[in-house]
């Protein structure tokens, strides 16, 4: 009977992850099975007895609709299946969270999983000694994740992972289709942000990295291998005279575009998705080698890996990953050639139906971090009109 029940549990669990069984029916089945014989064996058996005894695991994220989706589609089913509570924390920004991690004792000890901002933070946490080596064989849903999203992490940790890629986006170009045609935007590419006819109607983010990236594209250079920095600085000085506003937040970006104070700007794909959903005539252009980024679920040193593997598997389940994508406006890390993706996600800016992310360029953290002090300081002077 025990073996039969285990097989049934495994089968129902697999169907739930594939989206064939509703969350309600899955939880109902867990309750019946748990009352009959307890949850043991199969994927549930991946959790050792000490792990089952662990009463909780902590997850820190961005809050809001993203955390709500995690709670409904991952944390609640996980707790019902294992008895382990997920402590759901929130943070406002990456630097503040890292300070808290450093201040914990032992460093990182009270923190387990975190929804980090991709490759830069991944490299930073690895460099500080907070990384682990995940056993990929214990995260079955990892097989559905785009390889193109895993490779930047594995390049940092020599072929291993201390995190799983979770979602991605692009800092492309948002433009008002009432004044700029799709054909013109596509023809000009990154150089749209230097179009003379848009003088006084251009915007940009105040971030040094984004502006240098687009100046590199405008001058025909690879952003991770810039050869002529003088050309980049000259392009930014030229653009500075045409920029009406350097925005500092997503809300300000949306306001400038929605109120037609500017007609074109570098823009976060998720914010453009929100503007489009609100009915504003805003297009999104992702030029080749568009500044692309991703977010990951990072596992910190000292975390019970048996528990972490199982929780990550729940979070990568299509039902959960897609719900989070719909909540935050950024596509999931799931490979569309392996997992059915609903239209609500397919229409998001930055979505790639091929799963290959060709033309999506991720910043080389070693290269950019190595130039940060010099380039950020010079950019600040140019932005100020110097």
Residue locations for each model-derived region?
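N-terminal secretory signal peptides
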Residues: 1-25
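Extracytoplasmic ligand-binding site segments that recognize negatively charged/polar headgroups
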Residues: 64-71, 94-95, 115-258
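C-terminal segment of N-terminal export signals and the immediately downstream linker at the start
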Residues: 20, 42-63
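Mature extracytoplasmic/periplasmic domains
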Residues: 52-53, 295, 300-363
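Early extracytoplasmic/lumenal segment of secretory-pathway proteins
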Residues: 54-123
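A ligand-binding cleft/hinge motif common to bilobed small-molecule-binding domains
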Residues: 121-124, 258, 264-281
């Amino acid at each position: 009977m025990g073996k039969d029940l285990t097989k049934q549990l495994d089968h129902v669990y697999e169907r739930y992850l594939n989206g064939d069984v509703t969350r309600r029916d899955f939880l109902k089945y867990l309750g019946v099975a748990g009352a009959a014989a307890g949850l043991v064996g199969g994927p549930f058996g991946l959790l050792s007895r000490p792990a089952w005894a662990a009463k909780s695991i902590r997850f820190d994220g961005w809050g809001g609709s993203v955390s709500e989706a995690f709670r409904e589609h991952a944390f609640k089913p996980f707790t019902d299946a294992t008895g382990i509570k997920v402590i759901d924390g929130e943070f406002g920004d990456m630097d503040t969270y890292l300070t808290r991690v450093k201040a914990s004792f032992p460093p990182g000890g009270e923190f387990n999983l975190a929804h980090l901002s991709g490759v830069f933070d991944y490299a930073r946490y690895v460099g500080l000694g907070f990384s682990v080596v995940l056993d990929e064989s214990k995260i079955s849903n990892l097989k559905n994740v785009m390889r193109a999203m895993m490779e930047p992490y594995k390049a940092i940790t020599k072929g291993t992972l201390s995190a799983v890629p979770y979602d991605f986006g692009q800092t492309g170009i948002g433009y008002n289709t009432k004044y700029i045609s799709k054909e013109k935007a596509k023809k000009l590419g990154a150089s749209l942000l230097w179009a003379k006819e848009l003088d006084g109607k251009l915007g940009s983010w105040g971030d040094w990295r984004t502006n240098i990236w687009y100046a590199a594209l405008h001058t025909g250079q690879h952003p991770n291998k810039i050869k002529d920095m003088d050309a980049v600085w000259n392009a930014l000085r030229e653009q500075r005279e045409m920029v009406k506003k350097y925005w500092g937040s997503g809300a300000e970006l949306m306001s400038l575009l929605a109120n037609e104070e500017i007609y074109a700007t570098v823009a976060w794909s998720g914010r453009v998705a929100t503007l489009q959903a609100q009915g504003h005539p805003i297009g999104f252009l992702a030029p080749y080698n568009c500044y692309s980024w991703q977010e990951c679920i990072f596992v910190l040193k000292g975390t019970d890996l048996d528990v972490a593997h199982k929780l990550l598997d729940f979070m990568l389940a299509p039902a959960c990953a897609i719900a989070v994508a719909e909540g935050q406006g950024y596509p999931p890390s799931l490979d569309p050639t392996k997992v059915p993706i609903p239209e609500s996600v397919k229409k998001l800016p930055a979505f790639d139906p091929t799963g290959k992310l060709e033309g999506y360029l991720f910043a080389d953290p070693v290269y950019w971090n190595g130039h940060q002090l010099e380039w950020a300081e010079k950019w600040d002077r140019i932005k100020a009109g110097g």
